[in-house]
Amino acid sequence: MSTDVLILNTAVTDLRRPDFEFADELVGKGGLAKCRTEDMPDYSQQQLAEWIEQGFATAGGPGNTAPLIARTGLKVAVGVNLGRGDYDGLDAQGRFFHDVLTANGIDMSQTYIHPDLHTGTTFIHSTIGQDRGGIAYFPGANDDYDFEIFKGAVERLRPRMVYYMYSGLSDRGDANGGRDLAEFIKWCRGNGAVTIVDSHTLTGNPHALIEQGVAVKEYRLLEPLLPEVDLFFTSCDEARLIENTLAPGRKWIEFGEHENNVHFLDFLTERFWRKDGRTKLFGVTVSDGAYEQHVNPDETVDGPNRIESRFMAGEVVDLVGAGDSFRAGLITYVTSHLDEFKAGSIDFTEAVQMGNLFASMFIKAPLEDRYGNIHAYDKMLKVVRSDVTYQSFDELQDALS
Protein backbone atom coordinates (compact mmCIF):
# COMPACT_ATOMS: atom_id res chain seq x y z
CA MET A 1 0.00 0.00 0.00
CA SER A 2 1.44 3.37 -0.99
CA THR A 3 1.91 6.23 1.43
CA ASP A 4 -0.60 9.07 1.27
CA VAL A 5 1.72 11.90 2.34
CA LEU A 6 5.53 12.01 2.56
CA ILE A 7 6.93 15.00 4.45
CA LEU A 8 10.59 15.84 3.89
CA ASN A 9 13.37 17.72 5.74
CA THR A 10 13.71 20.07 8.73
CA ALA A 11 13.49 17.68 11.64
CA VAL A 12 13.89 19.95 14.65
CA THR A 13 13.44 19.73 18.39
CA ASP A 14 12.21 23.03 19.83
CA LEU A 15 13.36 23.77 23.38
CA ARG A 16 11.56 26.52 25.35
CA ARG A 17 12.90 27.87 28.63
CA PRO A 18 12.80 31.21 30.46
CA ASP A 19 16.57 31.10 31.02
CA PHE A 20 17.44 31.03 27.31
CA GLU A 21 18.30 34.75 27.31
CA PHE A 22 21.19 33.98 24.99
CA ALA A 23 18.63 33.59 22.18
CA ASP A 24 17.76 37.30 22.58
CA GLU A 25 21.45 38.16 22.33
CA LEU A 26 21.86 36.06 19.18
CA VAL A 27 18.77 37.14 17.24
CA GLY A 28 17.28 40.09 19.18
CA LYS A 29 14.17 40.13 21.35
CA GLY A 30 11.32 38.71 19.32
CA GLY A 31 13.73 37.87 16.52
CA LEU A 32 14.01 34.65 14.55
CA ALA A 33 17.16 33.50 12.83
CA LYS A 34 18.88 30.52 11.30
CA CYS A 35 22.21 30.44 13.12
CA ARG A 36 25.43 28.68 12.22
CA THR A 37 25.54 25.11 13.48
CA GLU A 38 28.99 25.69 14.97
CA ASP A 39 27.60 28.54 17.10
CA MET A 40 25.12 26.31 18.95
CA PRO A 41 25.57 26.51 22.75
CA ASP A 42 27.66 23.64 24.03
CA TYR A 43 25.04 22.00 26.22
CA SER A 44 25.76 18.36 26.97
CA GLN A 45 23.56 15.61 25.60
CA GLN A 46 22.70 14.75 29.20
CA GLN A 47 21.49 18.32 29.79
CA LEU A 48 19.38 18.35 26.63
CA ALA A 49 17.89 14.97 27.54
CA GLU A 50 17.05 16.28 31.02
CA TRP A 51 15.21 19.30 29.61
CA ILE A 52 13.34 17.05 27.21
CA GLU A 53 12.35 14.76 30.08
CA GLN A 54 11.15 17.78 32.07
CA GLY A 55 8.75 18.75 29.28
CA PHE A 56 10.56 21.73 27.76
CA ALA A 57 10.63 20.26 24.23
CA THR A 58 8.25 19.95 21.30
CA ALA A 59 8.78 18.42 17.87
CA GLY A 60 8.96 21.14 15.21
CA GLY A 61 9.00 21.08 11.42
CA PRO A 62 7.17 17.89 10.41
CA GLY A 63 6.21 17.58 14.07
CA ASN A 64 3.79 20.46 13.44
CA THR A 65 2.13 18.71 10.50
CA ALA A 66 2.62 14.94 10.19
CA PRO A 67 0.74 13.91 13.39
CA LEU A 68 -2.18 16.19 12.49
CA ILE A 69 -2.56 14.62 9.05
CA ALA A 70 -2.15 11.10 10.45
CA ARG A 71 -4.90 11.62 13.03
CA THR A 72 -7.41 11.97 10.19
CA GLY A 73 -6.61 8.45 9.00
CA LEU A 74 -4.17 9.12 6.18
CA LYS A 75 -0.92 7.14 5.98
CA VAL A 76 1.96 9.56 6.62
CA ALA A 77 5.73 9.09 6.42
CA VAL A 78 8.56 11.48 7.20
CA GLY A 79 11.99 11.53 5.54
CA VAL A 80 14.52 13.50 7.59
CA ASN A 81 18.11 13.63 8.78
CA LEU A 82 18.66 12.95 12.49
CA GLY A 83 21.95 13.08 14.38
CA ARG A 84 23.81 9.99 15.55
CA GLY A 85 24.17 9.53 19.30
CA ASP A 86 23.88 7.35 22.38
CA TYR A 87 20.09 7.30 22.72
CA ASP A 88 19.37 4.06 20.87
CA GLY A 89 21.52 5.25 18.00
CA LEU A 90 20.33 8.87 17.91
CA ASP A 91 21.28 12.02 19.78
CA ALA A 92 18.90 13.22 22.49
CA GLN A 93 17.07 15.64 20.20
CA GLY A 94 16.75 13.09 17.42
CA ARG A 95 15.50 10.37 19.74
CA PHE A 96 12.82 12.74 21.08
CA PHE A 97 11.72 13.81 17.58
CA HIS A 98 11.67 10.22 16.33
CA ASP A 99 9.70 8.92 19.31
CA VAL A 100 7.09 11.69 19.20
CA LEU A 101 6.33 11.03 15.55
CA THR A 102 6.39 7.25 15.92
CA ALA A 103 3.99 7.49 18.86
CA ASN A 104 1.60 9.37 16.58
CA GLY A 105 1.56 6.71 13.89
CA ILE A 106 4.13 8.22 11.53
CA ASP A 107 6.28 5.94 9.37
CA MET A 108 9.87 6.92 10.26
CA SER A 109 11.51 4.18 8.19
CA GLN A 110 13.05 6.75 5.82
CA THR A 111 15.20 8.41 8.49
CA TYR A 112 18.83 9.05 7.55
CA ILE A 113 21.14 9.02 10.58
CA HIS A 114 23.82 11.63 9.98
CA PRO A 115 27.23 10.55 11.27
CA ASP A 116 28.61 14.02 11.99
CA LEU A 117 25.88 16.64 12.52
CA HIS A 118 23.34 16.94 15.34
CA THR A 119 19.59 16.91 14.91
CA GLY A 120 18.17 20.35 14.14
CA THR A 121 17.61 22.26 17.39
CA THR A 122 15.81 25.51 18.18
CA PHE A 123 16.22 27.43 21.43
CA ILE A 124 13.25 29.64 22.28
CA HIS A 125 13.39 32.19 25.07
CA SER A 126 9.97 31.83 26.69
CA THR A 127 8.77 35.07 28.27
CA ILE A 128 5.82 36.35 30.27
CA GLY A 129 3.53 39.09 29.00
CA GLN A 130 3.68 40.87 25.65
CA ASP A 131 7.45 40.75 25.11
CA ARG A 132 8.47 37.98 22.75
CA GLY A 133 11.73 36.17 23.28
CA GLY A 134 14.28 35.30 20.65
CA ILE A 135 14.11 32.11 18.58
CA ALA A 136 17.49 30.72 17.51
CA TYR A 137 17.48 27.79 15.06
CA PHE A 138 20.57 25.63 14.58
CA PRO A 139 20.09 23.40 11.50
CA GLY A 140 22.68 20.72 12.17
CA ALA A 141 21.92 17.68 10.01
CA ASN A 142 19.18 19.54 8.12
CA ASP A 143 21.88 21.54 6.36
CA ASP A 144 23.18 18.38 4.68
CA TYR A 145 19.93 17.14 3.12
CA ASP A 146 20.77 14.89 0.16
CA PHE A 147 18.00 14.60 -2.44
CA GLU A 148 19.59 11.45 -3.89
CA ILE A 149 19.04 9.67 -0.57
CA PHE A 150 15.41 10.72 -0.39
CA LYS A 151 14.65 9.88 -3.99
CA GLY A 152 14.94 6.35 -2.68
CA ALA A 153 12.25 7.13 -0.10
CA VAL A 154 9.92 8.35 -2.85
CA GLU A 155 10.57 5.24 -4.93
CA ARG A 156 9.98 2.90 -1.99
CA LEU A 157 6.87 4.58 -0.55
CA ARG A 158 5.23 5.87 -3.76
CA PRO A 159 3.56 8.82 -1.97
CA ARG A 160 0.52 10.48 -3.45
CA MET A 161 1.58 13.84 -1.97
CA VAL A 162 5.11 15.10 -1.27
CA TYR A 163 5.45 18.03 1.15
CA TYR A 164 8.90 19.63 1.47
CA MET A 165 9.56 21.71 4.60
CA TYR A 166 11.14 24.25 4.05
CA SER A 167 12.79 26.16 1.21
CA GLY A 168 15.32 28.51 2.79
CA LEU A 169 16.50 26.49 5.80
CA SER A 170 18.99 23.93 4.42
CA ASP A 171 22.36 24.75 2.88
CA ARG A 172 22.48 21.62 0.72
CA GLY A 173 18.74 21.54 0.10
CA ASP A 174 18.88 25.13 -1.15
CA ALA A 175 22.06 24.69 -3.19
CA ASN A 176 22.51 25.90 -6.74
CA GLY A 177 20.16 28.84 -6.23
CA GLY A 178 17.20 26.59 -5.43
CA ARG A 179 17.49 24.72 -8.72
CA ASP A 180 18.38 21.43 -7.01
CA LEU A 181 15.14 21.53 -5.01
CA ALA A 182 13.16 22.55 -8.09
CA GLU A 183 14.58 19.59 -10.03
CA PHE A 184 13.79 17.24 -7.13
CA ILE A 185 10.18 18.47 -6.98
CA LYS A 186 9.88 18.05 -10.75
CA TRP A 187 11.24 14.51 -10.36
CA CYS A 188 8.67 13.78 -7.63
CA ARG A 189 5.88 14.92 -9.96
CA GLY A 190 7.30 12.66 -12.63
CA ASN A 191 6.95 9.81 -10.16
CA GLY A 192 3.26 10.50 -9.68
CA ALA A 193 3.20 12.75 -6.61
CA VAL A 194 1.34 16.03 -6.19
CA THR A 195 3.76 18.48 -4.56
CA ILE A 196 3.72 21.31 -2.05
CA VAL A 197 6.67 23.29 -0.69
CA ASP A 198 6.67 25.80 2.14
CA SER A 199 9.20 28.64 2.32
CA HIS A 200 10.47 29.66 5.71
CA THR A 201 12.95 32.48 6.00
CA LEU A 202 13.61 33.54 9.56
CA THR A 203 13.67 37.33 9.80
CA GLY A 204 13.54 39.38 12.96
CA ASN A 205 11.42 42.32 11.85
CA PRO A 206 9.42 41.55 8.70
CA HIS A 207 7.27 44.69 8.88
CA ALA A 208 10.31 46.97 8.76
CA LEU A 209 11.74 45.02 5.83
CA ILE A 210 8.42 45.21 3.98
CA GLU A 211 8.18 48.97 4.47
CA GLN A 212 11.77 49.48 3.34
CA GLY A 213 11.31 47.22 0.31
CA VAL A 214 14.36 45.18 1.28
CA ALA A 215 15.09 42.04 -0.72
CA VAL A 216 15.61 38.84 1.29
CA LYS A 217 18.05 36.69 -0.65
CA GLU A 218 16.55 33.36 0.48
CA TYR A 219 13.32 34.18 -1.37
CA ARG A 220 15.25 34.12 -4.65
CA LEU A 221 15.28 30.35 -4.14
CA LEU A 222 11.58 30.39 -5.11
CA GLU A 223 12.30 31.60 -8.66
CA PRO A 224 13.09 28.13 -10.08
CA LEU A 225 10.86 26.32 -7.59
CA LEU A 226 7.42 27.89 -7.97
CA PRO A 227 6.83 26.77 -11.58
CA GLU A 228 7.35 23.17 -10.43
CA VAL A 229 5.13 22.93 -7.32
CA ASP A 230 1.42 22.17 -7.46
CA LEU A 231 0.46 24.01 -4.25
CA PHE A 232 2.04 26.97 -2.50
CA PHE A 233 0.62 28.94 0.43
CA THR A 234 2.48 31.66 2.30
CA SER A 235 1.62 34.22 4.97
CA CYS A 236 0.58 37.77 4.12
CA ASP A 237 3.88 39.14 5.49
CA GLU A 238 5.99 36.63 3.60
CA ALA A 239 4.01 37.38 0.44
CA ARG A 240 5.22 40.97 0.54
CA LEU A 241 8.80 39.94 1.29
CA ILE A 242 8.70 37.48 -1.62
CA GLU A 243 7.49 40.09 -4.08
CA ASN A 244 9.91 42.71 -2.75
CA THR A 245 12.66 40.22 -3.62
CA LEU A 246 11.42 38.88 -6.96
CA ALA A 247 9.66 41.97 -8.34
CA PRO A 248 10.55 45.04 -6.24
CA GLY A 249 8.79 48.36 -6.43
CA ARG A 250 5.32 48.02 -4.93
CA LYS A 251 4.46 50.51 -2.16
CA TRP A 252 2.45 48.17 0.04
CA ILE A 253 1.39 50.82 2.55
CA GLU A 254 -0.46 52.70 -0.19
CA PHE A 255 -2.98 49.86 -0.54
CA GLY A 256 -5.30 47.93 1.75
CA GLU A 257 -4.62 44.36 2.84
CA HIS A 258 -7.25 42.89 0.53
CA GLU A 259 -5.87 44.67 -2.52
CA ASN A 260 -2.31 43.62 -1.62
CA ASN A 261 -3.24 39.96 -1.27
CA VAL A 262 -5.15 39.94 -4.55
CA HIS A 263 -2.23 41.67 -6.26
CA PHE A 264 0.28 39.14 -4.92
CA LEU A 265 -1.70 36.11 -6.10
CA ASP A 266 -2.17 37.66 -9.53
CA PHE A 267 1.60 38.24 -9.59
CA LEU A 268 2.35 34.62 -8.64
CA THR A 269 0.00 33.18 -11.24
CA GLU A 270 1.22 35.44 -14.03
CA ARG A 271 4.88 34.84 -13.22
CA PHE A 272 5.00 31.17 -12.32
CA TRP A 273 2.13 29.34 -13.99
CA ARG A 274 3.12 27.16 -16.93
CA LYS A 275 0.76 25.81 -19.60
CA ASP A 276 1.41 22.18 -18.76
CA GLY A 277 -2.12 20.87 -18.19
CA ARG A 278 -2.06 20.52 -14.41
CA THR A 279 -3.92 22.17 -11.56
CA LYS A 280 -2.01 24.88 -9.65
CA LEU A 281 -3.17 26.33 -6.32
CA PHE A 282 -1.56 29.43 -4.79
CA GLY A 283 -2.65 31.07 -1.56
CA VAL A 284 -2.00 33.62 1.19
CA THR A 285 -2.94 33.04 4.82
CA VAL A 286 -4.28 35.99 6.80
CA SER A 287 -5.43 36.55 10.37
CA ASP A 288 -8.97 35.25 9.83
CA GLY A 289 -8.66 32.87 6.88
CA ALA A 290 -6.91 32.75 3.53
CA TYR A 291 -6.96 33.86 -0.10
CA GLU A 292 -6.63 31.35 -2.94
CA GLN A 293 -6.21 31.45 -6.68
CA HIS A 294 -6.14 28.35 -8.85
CA VAL A 295 -5.54 27.45 -12.46
CA ASN A 296 -7.34 24.42 -13.86
CA PRO A 297 -5.90 21.97 -16.41
CA ASP A 298 -7.98 23.67 -19.13
CA GLU A 299 -6.10 26.92 -18.33
CA THR A 300 -9.08 28.70 -16.76
CA VAL A 301 -8.09 30.88 -13.80
CA ASP A 302 -10.36 31.33 -10.77
CA GLY A 303 -9.75 33.93 -8.08
CA PRO A 304 -8.21 35.40 -6.12
CA ASN A 305 -10.93 34.41 -3.66
CA ARG A 306 -11.03 35.47 -0.02
CA ILE A 307 -12.21 32.65 2.24
CA GLU A 308 -12.95 33.79 5.78
CA SER A 309 -12.59 31.11 8.42
CA ARG A 310 -15.84 29.86 9.96
CA PHE A 311 -13.92 28.48 12.91
CA MET A 312 -12.65 31.51 14.82
CA ALA A 313 -15.29 30.62 17.46
CA GLY A 314 -15.01 33.98 19.17
CA GLU A 315 -11.68 32.97 20.72
CA VAL A 316 -9.03 32.45 18.03
CA VAL A 317 -7.44 35.85 17.53
CA ASP A 318 -4.99 35.37 14.67
CA LEU A 319 -4.36 32.43 12.31
CA VAL A 320 -1.20 33.82 10.69
CA GLY A 321 1.13 32.02 13.11
CA ALA A 322 -0.50 28.66 12.35
CA GLY A 323 0.74 28.20 8.80
CA ASP A 324 2.05 24.67 9.32
CA SER A 325 -1.25 23.43 10.74
CA PHE A 326 -3.19 25.27 8.02
CA ARG A 327 -1.16 23.46 5.37
CA ALA A 328 -1.72 20.17 7.22
CA GLY A 329 -5.47 20.66 6.83
CA LEU A 330 -5.16 21.74 3.21
CA ILE A 331 -2.97 18.73 2.41
CA THR A 332 -5.38 16.39 4.18
CA TYR A 333 -8.29 17.63 2.07
CA VAL A 334 -6.42 17.65 -1.25
CA THR A 335 -4.93 14.20 -0.67
CA SER A 336 -8.37 12.86 0.23
CA HIS A 337 -9.75 14.25 -3.06
CA LEU A 338 -6.66 13.91 -5.22
CA ASP A 339 -8.32 12.85 -8.47
CA GLU A 340 -10.67 15.84 -8.26
CA PHE A 341 -7.70 18.13 -7.57
CA LYS A 342 -5.86 16.86 -10.64
CA ALA A 343 -9.00 17.35 -12.74
CA GLY A 344 -9.58 20.86 -11.38
CA SER A 345 -13.00 19.85 -10.03
CA ILE A 346 -12.13 19.88 -6.33
CA ASP A 347 -14.01 22.27 -4.03
CA PHE A 348 -11.22 24.79 -3.43
CA THR A 349 -13.22 26.68 -0.81
CA GLU A 350 -13.69 23.50 1.22
CA ALA A 351 -9.98 22.77 0.90
CA VAL A 352 -9.10 26.15 2.38
CA GLN A 353 -11.74 25.84 5.10
CA MET A 354 -10.21 22.52 6.13
CA GLY A 355 -6.94 24.39 6.52
CA ASN A 356 -8.71 27.06 8.56
CA LEU A 357 -10.26 24.41 10.81
CA PHE A 358 -6.94 22.67 11.45
CA ALA A 359 -5.29 26.00 12.25
CA SER A 360 -7.94 26.99 14.79
CA MET A 361 -7.87 23.59 16.47
CA PHE A 362 -4.07 23.52 16.66
CA ILE A 363 -3.74 27.05 18.02
CA LYS A 364 -6.07 26.24 20.90
CA ALA A 365 -4.46 22.91 21.80
CA PRO A 366 -2.37 22.80 24.99
CA LEU A 367 1.35 22.04 24.57
CA GLU A 368 0.93 18.78 26.50
CA ASP A 369 -1.68 17.56 23.98
CA ARG A 370 -0.76 19.41 20.79
CA TYR A 371 -2.51 17.04 18.39
CA GLY A 372 -5.57 16.07 20.40
CA ASN A 373 -7.99 18.52 18.76
CA ILE A 374 -7.68 16.87 15.33
CA HIS A 375 -10.10 14.01 14.66
CA ALA A 376 -10.95 11.46 11.98
CA TYR A 377 -11.41 12.93 8.51
CA ASP A 378 -15.13 12.26 8.28
CA LYS A 379 -15.72 14.26 11.47
CA MET A 380 -13.56 17.15 10.28
CA LEU A 381 -15.26 17.15 6.87
CA LYS A 382 -18.73 17.13 8.44
CA VAL A 383 -17.87 20.30 10.36
CA VAL A 384 -16.35 21.93 7.26
CA ARG A 385 -19.50 21.15 5.27
CA SER A 386 -21.91 22.35 7.94
CA ASP A 387 -23.34 25.85 7.72
CA VAL A 388 -22.87 26.45 11.44
CA THR A 389 -20.96 29.45 12.73
CA TYR A 390 -19.64 28.33 16.10
CA GLN A 391 -20.04 30.86 18.89
CA SER A 392 -17.45 29.32 21.20
CA PHE A 393 -14.53 26.96 21.01
CA ASP A 394 -16.32 24.51 23.29
CA GLU A 395 -19.18 24.39 20.79
CA LEU A 396 -16.72 23.70 17.98
CA GLN A 397 -15.05 20.94 20.00
CA ASP A 398 -18.42 19.37 20.78
CA ALA A 399 -19.23 19.26 17.06
CA LEU A 400 -16.05 17.26 16.47
CA SER A 401 -16.41 14.86 19.38
Residue ranges of predicted features:
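Hydrophobic beta-strand scaffold residues
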Residues: V76, M108, T195-I196
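A glycine-rich helix N-cap at a beta->alpha junction
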Residues: F97-L117
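Glycine-rich phosphate/adenosyl-contacting loop at the front of the ribokinase-like
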Residues: M1-G79, F96-D99, A103, V316-L319, ...
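Cofactor-binding loop segments of dinucleotide-utilizing enzymes, especially the Rossmann-like FAD-
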Residues: T10, V80-R84, I113, S126-I128, ...
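Conserved beta-alpha-beta core of the PfkB/ribokinase-like small-molecule kinase fold
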Residues: M161-H263, D288-Y291
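Conserved phosphate-binding/catalytic region of the ribokinase-like
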Residues: M1-A11, R17, K186-G190, P206, ...
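Conserved phosphate-binding/catalytic loop of the ribokinase/pfkB sugar-kinase fold
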Residues: V78, S109-H114, T122-D171
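Active-site-proximal loop->helix
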Residues: D86-N104, I124-S126
